[in-house]
Amino acid sequence: MATVIRPVISEKNKYWIDKHRHYELKHFCLQYPVWKKIYAEFSDASVSLSMIERVPTSNIPGDPTAKRALMRTYYGERIKLLEKVALEADLYLHKYILKAVTEGLSYTYLKTRLGIPCGKDMYYDRYRRFFWLLSQARD
């Protein structure tokens, strides 16, 4: 069973955020693989109009090209936000952090399967820093 990091840490911790805010951000991150898939589909010029019509876009004009561009921008901004914040959290561990927060992976998995080059304490410090930075970026 995977280690589950507790969303509640001491309010004295430099990266403290509210428990419910942590859950909100965690679930925001877990949407990343879906965003990547949809972004790739909207980047493909051969995507049929039926794909565009499936996405709820009630406030977007009827022009399919405009819809495609707006949806690429929408998903692209979210993808870039997570990648930028992971890079800010740690220059060397950003790939591991991004993989962990977007796929729900534990430190144990990162260490045994992916060979993360740091200890548990350092990793979880950067993990908390990631969510703290993301919270600031999303405000």
Model-derived segments and spans:
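Short amphipathic alpha helix immediately N-terminal
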Residues: 88-105
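Long, hydrophobic, amphipathic alpha-helical segments used as structural scaffolds
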Residues: 43, 90-93, 134, 138
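DNA major-groove recognition helices of helix-turn-helix
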Residues: 123-137
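Short amphipathic alpha-helical surface patches that mediate protein-protein
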Residues: 98-102, 115, 128
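Short acidic alpha-helix initiation/capping motifs at coil-to-helix transition points
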Residues: 73-76, 101-103, 123
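N-terminal interaction/assembly modules
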Residues: 1-88, 108
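Helix-turn-helix DNA-binding module
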Residues: 103-120
